Amino acid sequence: MNHKKLYIDTVGCQMNVNDSERIVTMLQPLGYTQTSRRHEAALILFNTCTVRAGAEECLLQNIANLKNLKRKKPGTLIGVAGCVAQQMGAELLQKFPWVDLVFGTHNLHLVPEMVKDAEAGRRRAETDFLDSSERLDLFPPIEGRKRVSAFVTVMQGCDNFCSYCIVPYVRGREISRRFAEILQEVQDLAAQGLREVVLLGQNVNSYGLKGEEQPSFAELVRAVAAVSGIDRVRFVTSHPKDMSDDLIACFADLAKLCGSLHLPAQAGNNRILKAMNRGYSREHYLETIYKLRQARPEIKITGDMIVGFPGETEAEFEETLSLMEEVRYFDLFSFVYSPRPGTKAAELSDELAKEVKLARLDRLQKLQAVHSRIHNETYVGSTQQVLVEGLAKRHGQVSGRCDSGRIVNLAGSPALIGKLVDVKILEGYANSLLGELL
């Protein structure tokens, strides 16, 4: 077999990471192996995100920069996948004549065929959405996973249509994967020696809510936690309105379910939340946090915040800061509002000045830096169970995660990879911890 190199530049959410892993698996029969060196690749793929304008602009610039490479190495294939591909489709082929293939979020199953066409000189774009029955059969297994932890897709798409968000338009409507199929994949991963699974979906805790004859997401979490050989279970990303009491009870009942949860609030003011079409109030969100901490007192909450939504007043922004003070997020991903074409919010006329949005983002991030530092300082001197995942950047160290998901680096040999070890935490940094093996 002719061995060829595949380079994938993946940005965006965990679903994109998972899709890239599936693409690697699907192209192996064609002789492609993944490389981290773009210059040696026979096929360069961009798996893209369009949630914010900046990511889309960066992608278009990256493609433009490959014009000279294509001129020097005309045999190199260039492709675009993911949400920008879904949104722009054949327009990318027209705009960039050196791009060979474009495939959307429902078209991963066509990748081998499209690559063969590209190798034969036939350019192609595929962005058709599939119906739910067709999509149910398009969860190909990911082969050759040598890591300690793995994503397992349980649902795709989103039905929430938050006013600022383009995801439902580029990922499609929600569909829940078959319960038995998910459990079989988890059992197969356990048999391969993986120790942790992360249940994945755009709106993971809406699994089974759309009239499908499926168990609830809480029942799925309990079933996955019961699989022998799996030591840790996580799930991402959750929507506050779908955080059921049964699911919250899992944090009290299941030792394998890690004590961390990503629960995006997006804003702290009720008028803004309603304008965003989030489907819950500030009070409901805080009640959910209270219930979670009753179930698992040490649970670490992470979240997302959007700053500068159209019409946001100073007083409304202050309510976001006060929500942060009440929740005390472990980590927070924060962004300036970015209008996306086709969304309801993009039609609003009262967008804030850029300097106002940036100033508010700076204030928010400084507050979160204080909270994150306090969280990290509480670890110093404690003993944490760490699942070692791989080598650290520093020579002689390995890296893993404690129950909260925080990265822990420690001196140790590669023989520790895949093991759960007790570690004493020596120092806390902005985004990681330093420990020593006990």
Swiss-Prot record:
[4Fe-4S] cluster 1 binds at C13, C49, C83. Keywords: 4Fe-4S, Cytoplasm, Iron, Iron-sulfur, Metal-binding, S-adenosyl-L-methionine, Transferase, tRNA processing. The keyword Glycoprotein does not apply. GO terms for cellular component: cytosol. Residues 144-377 form the Radical SAM core domain. Pfam families: Radical_SAM (PF04055), TRAM (PF01938), UPF0004 (PF00919). Residues 4-120 form the MTTase N-terminal domain. Residues 377-438 form the TRAM domain. [4Fe-4S] cluster 2 binds at C158, C162, C165. Monomer. This is tRNA-2-methylthio-N(6)-dimethylallyladenosine synthase. It comes from Trichlorobacter lovleyi (strain ATCC BAA-1151 / DSM 17278 / SZ) (Geobacter lovleyi). The lineage of its organism: Bacteria, Pseudomonadati, Thermodesulfobacteriota, Desulfuromonadia, Geobacterales.
